[in-house]
UniProtKB/Swiss-Prot annotation:
Description of how the protein assembles with itself and partners: Homodimer.
Transmembrane region(s): none
MF GO annotations: NADP binding; shikimate 3-dehydrogenase (NADP+) activity
Pfam families: SDH_C, Shikimate_dh_N
Protein name (record): Shikimate dehydrogenase (NADP(+))
Catalysed reactions, semicolon-separated: shikimate + NADP(+) = 3-dehydroshikimate + NADPH + H(+)
Ligand binding (NADP(+)): 84, 131-135, 217, 240
Role description: Involved in the biosynthesis of the chorismate, which leads to the biosynthesis of aromatic amino acids. Catalyzes the reversible NADPH linked reduction of 3-dehydroshikimate (DHSA) to yield shikimate (SA).
Binding site for shikimate: 20-22, 68, 93, 109, 219
Pathway(s) it belongs to: Metabolic intermediate biosynthesis; chorismate biosynthesis; chorismate from D-erythrose 4-phosphate and phosphoenolpyruvate: step 4/7
EC number: 1.1.1.25
Entry's family note: Belongs to the shikimate dehydrogenase family.
UniProt record, GO biological process: amino acid biosynthetic process; aromatic amino acid family biosynthetic process; chorismate biosynthetic process; shikimate metabolic process
Amino acid sequence: MSHPYASPFAEVIGDPIAQSKSPLIHGFWLDALGMEGDYRRAHVKADALAAYIAERRADPGWRGCNVTMPHKAAVMDLVDDPGDIRGTIGAMNTIVRQPDGSLIGTNTDAAGFYSPLAELDLEGAPIAVVGAGGAARAVLFALARAKVGKVAILNRSPLKAMGLLATFGLKGDVVALDAALPPVRLLVNASSLGMAGQPPLDLDLSPLPDDAIVYDLVYSPLRTGLLKAAEARGLDTVDGLDMLIGQAALAFELFFGAPPPEGRDDELRALLVA
């Protein structure tokens, strides 16, 4: 893979960070394009975040970083231009260093989530989303831009879910996790349910129409119980690697000035699940 400490370089920061697959993704693309550069993990604790940003800002070889938990909110106060993130998604997952050392923050999660759905016309379509955390905010932001119809949020905290509908100007309802699913066009799991080490997401998919799509943001395991149930019903599915790769593709171009190579996604997916 790409050589460590090559310049230019970008990083992914978080605490913990060892589990991140971002270095595999960006390293694969750098090698495939024959580009100079590197992308690596940086374990940054909360009390060292400001010092990390200040140090990297002064390094002209540093192109920026992706941001994972628990820093996605805190970094908004450490960049020069956070855009409209604070009042919308409320989380920043990408920082890009400009030639003058100024830092621009953005969030590629929403666009990354929507990339495998881009060919669909979801305007006015009914949607169901499981979860009301940070991932759900990115999902709802993207769905609002797509002008979807009513959105049902399945979540244990009704007030939090209703607040998200209001934040993104969406019409819809809050549904209990054990209630019957509405007959939606798209069902998205934006929670940690079904992830390795977490409780399963047990939903009865029988109310879904035959043309429904089931999208699970979880990618460990890749074939979650939800996706297996959807496949058993003959429904189209989208797994969590699509969002992971989609958001990384946008960040890669911001960091290194070139889009990822085309036609190599199957190789990349095989690398990520190996």
